[in-house]
Swiss-Prot record:
Described purpose of this protein according to its UniProt entry: Functions in endoplasmic reticulum to Golgi vesicle-mediated transport and regulates the proper organization of the endoplasmic reticulum and the Golgi. Plays a key role in targeting to neuronal dendrites receptors such as HTR1A. Plays also a role in primary cilium and sperm flagellum assembly probably through protein transport to these compartments.
InterPro entries (UniProt xref): Yif1_fam (IPR005578)
Disulphide bridges: none
Mode of membrane association: Multi-pass membrane protein
Protein name: Protein YIF1B-B
Transmembrane segments: 143-163, 179-199, 206-226, 228-248, 279-299
Domain of life: Eukaryota
One Gene Ontology term, aspect cellular component: endoplasmic reticulum-Golgi intermediate compartment membrane
Stretches of the chain found on the membrane's Cytoplasmic side: 1-142, 200-205, 249-278
Native source organism of the sequence: Xenopus laevis
Subcellular location field: Endoplasmic reticulum membrane; Golgi apparatus membrane; Endoplasmic reticulum-Golgi intermediate compartment membrane
Underlying gene: yif1b-b
């Protein structure tokens, strides 16, 4: 043996990280961006398509779209049926006509209710066989003033009861209920009278509610006058408002209830026309009775 072979060559020291096949010990995941993923860690999902969307999504998406379309169709059909049934009971589209008002109309109409004596033209204007909106015709009936007047009447009644130390929610509720009940009774009585007299008129139930509700404007004026000036102010203002509403109702309803000849000023002849005239006078005459009955106990 020679001397050189008696000594073993010192082993080569491995430098950490010198082997490119060994990953960095501080790296949590393998870097697969530079090459193919090792076959040992490859777990292909054979149930997934190429875009990475599960195969069930392709099956469920058409079903969900169909369900959404079917549900929308059912909802729209149900809404149409509900609208038809509601419109059959309560003509919402027609009621909107009675609230087509503006500030100018409200001011003029209240002035007409309080001072109707100088007004000349009482005919309702039409456009293509349809009455124009109230904001374009002061003679057209509306529901805005009656509804607001009814609510204001309840508030003024509560104020009057409060000044007399008689206010309570129960009494105010009874006041509102009685006023509404008398209004319903009045409208039903007018409808029954029109049916018995067999009057062919274009008056609708909503028109009658509007005309019957105009008296609340005079009732409010009377109660406020009573609060400010006592019983004397109440009776004076209420008497004026009663005369005004009677005049207003006669001049308005005579064009609706009486015959065309009577509406034009021709002498009323015949038993049927006499009944229509009496009916018009009765509807107008009953307004002051309700006005006094619903307000006299509020002023003391």
């Amino acid at each position: 043996m020679n001397q050189e072979s008696s000594f073993r060559a010192p082993p080569k020291r491995r430098v950490r990280g010198s082997n490119p096949n060994i990953s960095n010990p501080h790296q949590l995941f393998d870097d697969t961006s530079g090459g193919p993923v090792p076959h040992g860690g490859d777990f292909p999902n054979h149930s997934s398509p190429a875009l990475g969307i599960p195969a069930q999504a392709f099956l469920s998406e058409p079903m969900s779209n169909f369900a959404m379309a079917y549900g929308s169709s059912l909802a729209s059909q149900g809404k149409e049926m509900m609208d038809k049934n509601i419109d059959r009971i309560i003509p919402v589209s027609k009621i909107k006509y009675y609230f087509a008002v503006d500030t100018v109309y409200v001011g003029k109409k209240i002035g007409l209710l309080m001072f109707p004596y100088m007004h000349q033209d009482w005919e309702v204007r039409y456009q293509q066989d349809t009455p124009v909106a109230p904001r374009f015709d002061i003679n057209a009936p509306d529901l805005y003033i009656p509804v607001m007047a009814f609510i204001t009447y309840i508030l003024v009644a509560g104020l009057a009861l409060g000044t007399q130390s008689r206010f309570s929610p129960e009494i105010l509720g009874m006041q509102a209920s009685s006023a509404l009940a008398w209004l319903i009774v009045e409208v039903l009585a007018i409808l029954l009278s029109l049916y018995l007299v067999t009057v062919n008129t274009d008056l609708t139930t909503v028109d009658l509610v509007a005309f019957s509700g105009y008296k609340y404007v005079g009732m409010i004026s009377g109660v406020i006058a009573g609060l400010l000036f006592g019983n004397t102010g109440y009776y004076v203002v209420l008497a004026w408002c009663c005369i005004s509403i009677v005049f207003f109702m006669i001049r308005t309803l005579r064009l609706k209830i009486l015959s065309e000849a009577a509406a034009e000023g021709v002498l009323v002849r015949g038993a049927r026309n006499q009944l229509r005239m009496y009916l018009t006078m009765a509807i107008a005459a009953v307004q002051p009775i309700f006005m006094y009955w619903l307000t006299y106990h509020l002023v003391r």
